[in-house]
Amino acid sequence: MTQLPWMGLGLSTNLGPRDRPDPWWILDASPGAIDFVEYSAPLDPDVALAEAPRFSTLLERRHELPAIFHPVHLNLWGPALESEENLAALRAHLRRVGSPWVGNDVAWWHHRDAPFPGYLFVAPPFTRAGVEQAAAHAAHVQAAIEVPLLLENPAVLHRNGDLHVLDFMAALHARTGQPLLLDLGHLLAFQLVYGLEAEARLDGFPLEQVAEIHIAGGVITTRGARRFYVDDHGQPVREELFALLERILPRCTGLRAVTFEADGHPEPIALRTLERLRALVPRRREPQAAGIAAANDDAALEAPATCATASQDDGWGSAATAAPPGAVDGAAREAWRLFDLVHGAPADGVPDPDGLRAEVDFRLAVVAQRIDRAWPLTRAACAGDRAGLERFATSPEYRSLFDGSGRQLPAVFAAWARRVVREERLAGADAILAFESWCHGLLARVEAAPPGSGAIRLAPGVAVGSFPVDLSELLFAARTLRRHLADRAAAAGLYEGSGLEALRQIAARAAPGPWAVLLRRTGGAIAAEPLDPSFLRLVHLAARGATPADLPPADREALGRAVAAGVLVAGDR
């Protein structure tokens, strides 16, 4: 096994142009705050360079700030082994970056290279069969790469299997010999599912085989007698996790890194957490520092060895033994059964209906959030409540996301909505769907056209047009109705999305147009609003080549407002 160096304290990032925190800003502003960066990006390094703008910065500055690759595109469970093409890309990626290891949650992340929305993986059943299936995946990946694969405990919100997650991971380590990555938030999520203390079952867990620890933010909510922890890196770290980290650090004698997954935190806020973690995790591994076992910082250390007693005494077989034939084949039916369950498919006899409902709720919320960036009004009209979202998430259209065709969630939702509107004759929903389809078409035409060069022109990401029906009341109602329902939900603890049905009534009674509309695309989302008539006049004047100097005083005043509103650009700006 490759040797593992001491890495220290790291910060995670997604490498997008607006992703925060920026680890290189922190490195420059506060030297010594972090020792490495851990990041997610496409497996193919060339694709990462094209799609993740900060990947080039990572490569340029990796000698100042070493990097560890933490992909979210790597299956360590599921119906099929990772493709040879993906593994070749992963191998090339790790070589280019010089990542000392790669870690990933033991879960099903994608099917035929289509990731599940929000990268919400499907965790394996915590059973003996699940161990064998995951072991086959892990062995397949490890055989294709030149650095150690760290196995991370996945987060769950419902009970599925007869093993504690720590027992599952210990057995998986015994079966494969792979080092472990312990995610404290994921562990807390499991403990709450079973009503256990945060440290339950740690006494029998091989903490000495943990090479990396993840700590991140999350949210704890209460439903009846149950409490649930939702892993949300954009939230502050909870005190329960700081306390758990302090208690287990002295026992993690093989530890090489602690990573703060801080996605979405402004740099000054992230620095506060890093300062607290730095008191526990030294830059150099020195004797007795923070209770971590002594080691020479300059010496590369052997990767944690297989726990022989666990593999023999617990009957899991040795790490050198290949996974049984058909281990992955046996996962296919179970994987798709769980896929359907966590998306809301009806089922009898599930062991934890309350936990499963929490899991489905979280997943549907993420699906709705993604749809609302492209089809907010149509989603409200056709799938505004939980039942509607379940219908979509269990539909053939949704399943087609994962058939290898390359279709994206917004397009798949639009196809489903067209079918539902046609088959169920939803009065008003047809007008809403037609309007948002028109919006997409108009923006696509504007964005495909060469940029304007006139003295007055539309701002980037802006389009104006005329729709044959006046839906201005619909836009008003969508804002006020959502606010009304959100305010009630904040007090009552229940979001009654069925109330969004009123939008169909309003669209059905819309007055004839023409109706002037302003469209904006911001960060991938589309927003529509009625267009100020004075702005529309300016757009027409601009199309005829008018300059600011040509405008009468009233139009020049309107031009100033349009420029300030980000609708028009005047002159060379």
Feature map (PLM): residue ranges:
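Boundary/entry segment of secreted carbohydrate-active catalytic domains
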Residues: M1-I26
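Acidic (Asp/Glu)-rich catalytic clusters
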Residues: W25-G32, A50-F69, E85-P100, A139-A144, ...
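Conserved, mostly hydrophobic/aromatic
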Residues: V37, V102, D183, I213, ...
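Gly/Pro-rich active-site loop or hairpin
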Residues: A48-A50, L81, F121-A123, R128, ...
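Active-site acidic/histidine proton-transfer and metal-coordination neighborhood
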Residues: S83-L180
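Acidic/histidine-rich catalytic cores of soluble enzymes
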Residues: Q142-A225
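Long, charge-rich, low-complexity alpha-helical segments
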Residues: R283, I292-S453, L519-R573
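Low-complexity, glycine/alanine/valine/leucine- and proline-rich hydrophobic stretches
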Residues: V462-R544
